[in-house]
Structure formats: C-alpha cells, structure tokens
C-alpha cells in the first residue's frame, strides 16, 4: 500500500502536467518549427511564437478549429514577433485566429504580387480572425495587406473578422483590405458573389496619397450585384489618403456604423450596390491643409442617418461638399443616387455645401450620351430631421442644386441656421425646436445584429474615436509618421517615389 501511495505521488503531478500542457500551447522559435506545429495542431490548440524576427516566413495553415475551439496562432509577447522579408500568411482552414504579429521590413518579389490578387495575409477559410496585428510600410510589392480570397475551386470565405489592427504608411498600390466574393467584377446583370458576413472593427488606417485610382482603405465586393452584408464599425481613419475613396463599397447590404474619418482627403463611397447603411459616423476636418471629404453616394435604397459632418475644408475636384449624391443613369457604372432615406444627420460648419445634388454632372452627361443612357438627377429622397448649421464666415450655401432637384424630394423636420439655403424649400430656422425624427420602417440587414430603427431614432450618439480606442492592446504609439504629420519619413518617401515610378513604367 505504501508503494502504491508513493507511486501515486509521482504520477499525479505528471498527469496534471499532461492535462495542462495543451492549454499552455506550444512555443515555437523558428520558421521550420512553426510550419511543423501548425500541421499537427488540433481544434482548441494554441501555438505561441517566441520573440524574434521571422524572416521570409511562409505560414500556410490548412488545419481547422471548431466553433468554440479555434486554433490560435499568436505572439508569445505581442509586439515582439516580427514577420519580415519574403513573408506571406495563408489561412486556408477554418476557425483560425492570428494575433499580435508585427509585419514590417518586407522584400517580397515585386513581380510575384499584384493588385486584386491575394494579400500579404490571405484568408481562404471561413470563421477566421486577424486581431491585434500591425502592418507598417511593409514593402514595395503591390498587394493588399489583408484579403478574403476565393479558393482555387471558387469557394467564398464567410464570417471572418479583422479587428484591433493598425495599417500605416502603406506605399504600394491596391487597397489595405479587400473583401472578395467574386474573382472579378460581374457586369452581365446576373447575381454576383454570395453574402460574406465579415466584420472589420476597431482598426486604425493612415496611409499616404497615391496617383490615380490606387487603392483606398477597404473594398467590399466588385460590382453592384454582389451581396456583402459586411459590418464595418468602430474604426478610425486618420489621414487615410491613399485615393479619392476612403472606402469603396461595391456590394449590397453593407453597414458602416460608428466610424471616425479624421482629416481624410477622400470620401466614404457607396460606389456600387444598393441598400447600404451608414449610421453614426463622424466626418471631421480640423485643419485647412487639404480638402477633406464626407460621403459620395451612388445607387438606391440606402440609409444615411445620424452622421456628423464638420469639415474645415472640402474637396474642390469633387464639388466642395460633405455629402455628394450622384447624378447619372440608373443601375449603370455611375449609377444614379435615388430612393433613399437621409435622416437625423448634422452638418456643422462645413466649409462647402452640406449636400451637393449634382456633383460632376457634366462628366456624367458625357458618360450617359456615349452609352445611350438616360441622364437623371437624384430624386425620391426623404430628408428628415437633419440639422444644418454654420456660424463661421464660409461662402457656401447649404445646398448645391443646379436642377432644383430638391423640389422633387420630401423634406420633413429639418432645421437650417446660419447661411442661405441655396434652394427654395421649407426648412425651419428654429434650432430650439430641433429633435431627431423617429423611424420605424427600416428592415434589418440579414446577419447584422443591429436594430436600425432604434439607432436612427436616437439621433447622433457618442463622440469621434481616438487612437486609444482602436489600437492593438499592446501598442502604445502610432507607427510611422504620416498620421500625425501628413508626411512620410525621408527613407519611406524615397521608396514611395520608386514604387510610383515603377508603376508608371509598367
């Protein structure tokens, strides 16, 4: 009996250790060990990467976790694990989490990468998550930083999340994030890709301006018949200047909620795809160094509600406004903006028009004439409970409406104070009487758990986001220089010039 008790005394710690060890995960310290471990890891497994620089890491994860038992691959000490050189990550399994990695000092083969291809991190499987990672001026190869990409047999990843990541000083072409459900734009009128149901939240974007249509912060889908159903919320775009489109939303039924756009030289665009929602976003320009933007809207059946616009300068090339409503032909490449709700928004001291009802109209007329399409101006607009206010000596009236479009639309419960309206519509000048209107007929977006009617009826809530509210939990200071200075460092500026020159030559 004494022998058995003694044996049990030895075995018990060993059994405890065996049971606890899987919870602690495996710690890897080389590329080769990382590759081997991810081939063997099971659902619920944890792979921790030791501090260090992992040059030329080619991490391809094909194993899958399960609902409630994801496979997690993370930095042992977030911020002290660097993926550099000819790096790439492919998440081909499902229920995978990548956490706490810093992507920097890359040198991928320029010829091997291209815009609209897989990203530096390419997500091929569903239910995957990228969290608390940093992407800072990675290299000179044109690609997105993160993509959801179709598999070789055309399967579309769904229900993925990108959160609490920082994307700074990107000097290459293509968007920062591309969410794809087709391989290319489908323009024959047929239904595009299936719904994606992704979420991008609590991320930070700040990237320098590039020539042409070079790739903004986020693209969702390719064309108007794709179904997005993605939620983009609680992100901070601070000098996200890559191109004229901060976000290019090219699919249906996406929701943009609670984001902050600070000093961005572009607009948040409903570019293709009807029935999209923008609620409680903040569009702010607080200096006069550049022209800053709000929203540019194409398409129909949108909801634009409870957004706050305060722009110290506006974008001359687009028509100097906070909200642009596109004229043109219905359901075309430059689709007419019509049949939508614009409610409970605040336009405060916009150094431009609050709403431009016919931006770029001459260009749109030329396009319609060349393609034998009917040119129309925005109509069937329901403008309810909006506040227009100026107490600064800006020269613009509230509205730019060269065709008196406003007369074709519905105006209810709006208040305008401070300057001329610019159009002969009945809007109250009694600010004390202002209150948000109640909304009750907006249908929810499938797969997005937001009560749209309740959110809109509250009016604008909260305040603009700050760096501390979106940053990776382990990162105290903003990477790079562009966010705070609107300039790249000298060495990054030189690399940027080389990228632009190379792109022109090819």
From Swiss-Prot:
Keywords from the UniProt entry: Glycoprotein, Lyase, Pyrrolidone carboxylic acid, Signal
Positions annotated as active site in the UniProt record: 250, 272, 333
Pfam families, sorted: Chondroitinas_B
The keyword Lyase appears for this protein: yes
Residues glycosylated per entry: 234
Positions bearing Pyrrolidone carboxylic acid: 26
Substrates-to-products reaction catalysed: Eliminative cleavage of dermatan sulfate containing (1->4)-beta-D-hexosaminyl and (1->3)-beta-D-glucurosonyl or (1->3)-alpha-L-iduronosyl linkages to disaccharides containing 4-deoxy-beta-D-gluc-4-enuronosyl groups to yield a 4,5-unsaturated dermatan-sulfate disaccharide (DeltaUA-GalNAc-4S)
Any GO MF annotation of the entry: chondroitin B lyase activity
EC number(s) recorded for this UniProt protein: 4.2.2.19
Signal sequence range: 1-25
Quaternary context: Monomer.
Family the UniProt entry places it in: Belongs to the polysaccharide lyase 8 family.
Function: Cleaves the glycosaminoglycan, dermatan sulfate.
Protein name: Chondroitinase-B
Species, as recorded: Pedobacter heparinus (strain ATCC 13125 / DSM 2366 / CIP 104194 / JCM 7457 / NBRC 12017 / NCIMB 9290 / NRRL B-14731 / HIM 762-3)
């Amino acid at each position: 009996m004494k022998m058995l008790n003694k044996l049990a005394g030895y075995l018990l710690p060993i059994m405890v250790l065996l049971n606890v060890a899987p919870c602690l995960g495996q710690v890897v310290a080389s590329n080769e060990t990382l590759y081997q471990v991810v081939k063997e890891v099971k659902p619920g497994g944890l792979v921790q990467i030791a501090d260090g620089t992992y040059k030329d890491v080619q991490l391809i994860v094909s194993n899958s976790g399960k609902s409630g038992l994801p496979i997690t691959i993370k930095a042992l000490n977030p911020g002290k694990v660097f993926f550099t050189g000819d790096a790439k990550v492919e998440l081909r399994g499902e229920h995978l989490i990548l956490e706490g990695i810093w992507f920097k000092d890359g040198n991928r083969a320029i010829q091997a990468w291209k815009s609209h291809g897989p990203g530096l991190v390419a997500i091929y499987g569903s239910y995957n998550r990228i969290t608390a990672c940093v992407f800072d001026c990675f290299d000179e190869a044109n690609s997105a930083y993160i993509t959801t990409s179709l598999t070789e047999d055309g399967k579309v990843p769904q229900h993925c999340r990108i959160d609490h990541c920082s994307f700074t000083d990107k000097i290459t072409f293509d968007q920062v994030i591309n969410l794809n459900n087709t391989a290319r734009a489908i323009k024959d009128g047929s239904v595009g890709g299936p719904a994606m149901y992704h979420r991008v939240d609590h991320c930070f974007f700040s990237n320098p301006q590039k020539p042409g249509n070079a790739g903004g912060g986020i693209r969702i889908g390719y064309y108007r018949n794709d179904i997005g159903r993605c939620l983009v919320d609680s992100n901070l775009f601070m000098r996200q200047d890559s191109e004229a489109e901060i976000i290019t939303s090219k699919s249906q039924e996406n929701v943009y909620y609670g984001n902050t756009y600070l000093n961005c030289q572009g607009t948040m665009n409903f570019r293709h795809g009807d029935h999209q929602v923008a609620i409680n976003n903040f569009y702010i320009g607080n200096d006069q160094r550049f022209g800053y933007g709000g929203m540019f809207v194409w398409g129909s059946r949108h909801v634009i509600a409870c957004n706050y616009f305060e722009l110290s300068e506006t974008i001359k090339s687009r028509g100097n406004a906070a909200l642009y409503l596109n004229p043109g032909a219905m359901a075309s490449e430059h689709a007419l903006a019509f049949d939508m709700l614009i409610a409970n928004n605040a336009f405060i001291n916009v150094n431009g028009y609050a709403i431009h009802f016919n931006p770029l109209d001459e260009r749109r007329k030329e396009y319609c004439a060349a393609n034998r399409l009917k040119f129309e101006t925005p109509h069937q607009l329901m403008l309810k409970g909006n506040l227009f206010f100026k107490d600064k000596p800006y020269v613009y009236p509230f509205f730019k409406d060269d065709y008196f479009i406003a007369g074709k639309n519905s105006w209810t419960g709006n208040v305008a104070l401070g300057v001329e309206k610019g159009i002969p519509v009945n809007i109250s000048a009694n600010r004390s009487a202002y209150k948000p209107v109640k909304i009750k007929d907006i249908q929810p977006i499938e797969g997005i758990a937001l009560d749209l009617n309740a959110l809109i009826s509250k009016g604008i809530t909260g305040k603009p986001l700050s760096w501390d509210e979106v940053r990776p939990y382990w990162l105290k200071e903003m990477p790079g220089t562009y966010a705070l200075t609107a300039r790249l460092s000298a060495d990054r500026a030189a690399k940027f010039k080389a990228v632009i020159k190379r792109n022109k030559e090819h």
